[in-house]
Structure formats: C-alpha cells, structure tokens
Amino acid sequence: ECWSTKTATFMIGGNVCTRPCGFCSVPKGKTEELELDEPERVAEAAARLGLRYVVITSVTRDDLPDGGAEHWYQTVLAVRQRTGAQIEVLTPDFRGNRAAVTRVIESRPDVFNHNTETVPRLYHRVRRNADYQRTLDLLQQVKQEAPEMPTKSGLMLGLGETLEELYEVLADLRRVGCDMLTLGQYLQPSPEHLPVERFLPPEEFDEIGELAKKL
C-alpha cells in the first residue's frame, strides 16, 4: 500500500537504540558513531526511488548531547535538496531537550510526528525511559514555534488501556494542538516482548476515531 503511493520510511542514527521499550524489536545496547554521509545516502535513495512522501524516523540516541538533532536537520535538508517529496519526521523525545526539538523544526518538515504510544498508566511498562508529559510538551512546542506545521501522533491499542484512559489521551493531544492521530493494533514482536492483552475489532477503532474527531 505504501509503495503504491511512492511512500517509504527511513530509520537513521544506526540500528541500535539506547532505550529498552517493551514493545519494540529494535536492538538495544551500545551504539556506534553516527555515519556523517547518512543524510546524503538517504536523499540519494529517496531520489532514485522517485518517492513522493518520505518518512524519516530514528532510534533514540540518549548517548548524544543533542539526541541526534543535528543529524536529523541535515537529513531533512538533504532529502529536500534532492527530491520534491513531502517529508514527515517521526522523532524521539530528545530527553526533553527543547533546543534539539527546535533544531528539527528548523529543517521545516511537512509533518512533525511524535508518538504517544500508550496511556500514562502503562508508560512504566511500555516506555520505561519515556515520560507522558514530555511527549505532550514536545508536540506543544512544535505548535508554539511553528503554528503552521501539522503535528501528528500515534497510539498502539491492545496493551491493556481502557476507553476512558484513551479518551483522556485524546483530549490531552487536542489540548496541545495535535492535528493528526494514527491508531494501530499492537502486535507482539517476539515472546520476549509485551504480550497482546486484547485484539480490538474494527468497529472499536471506528468508535475511538469518532471520539477523536469530535474533540
């Protein structure tokens, strides 16, 4: 489906993450130095593939003073220079480093995405080194510094959240000016990861979507 619309996602910053999130299959551990030619290589790939929509995401790099923000900036600029594609960034939280977030904003992506992932009660289990309020603060900062830039967030469902908790998250996202929301069913990557508590039927996704649209 994505490829038919010339959409692709690139993960930058290496393939090892500094955070052990319970839902994610990306390897955790000791990271390597950033590859300084990576921005240009991503741009070349996007150009050769003729992409119309490029999503850039990354591992979390808590080992870097700016969390990799300058690398993000250079990657967005390189893709912009080589292609006419729209660019969406899906960033980590940069440990609440506002200057790092500002640097990514300065690259002027078409969409700024930062996932909420789950409800506050489950953060300690799902996103152990993340913080719910930090996520909201990041999305709000983007709106404050670039009001015209669409913001986006995503939630995984089926981890044990309640409808009431989801509604509170939807209200919080609306309060900080989040423009777009994606909802997805959590799927367990391996037996070592968090189990699926429930598979939601399509009509429940529709119900939650309608709740979000009414806010």
Placement of each model-derived feature along the sequence:
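Conserved alpha-helical substructure of the radical SAM core
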Residues: K28-V55
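N-terminal [4Fe-4S]-dependent radical SAM core
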Residues: E1-E33, Y53
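Auxiliary Fe-S-binding modules of radical SAM enzymes
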Residues: E1-K6, E40, E44, R48-G50, ...
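Active-site beta-loop-alpha junctions enriched in small/polar residues
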Residues: P27, V59-R61, L90-R95, E117-V119, ...
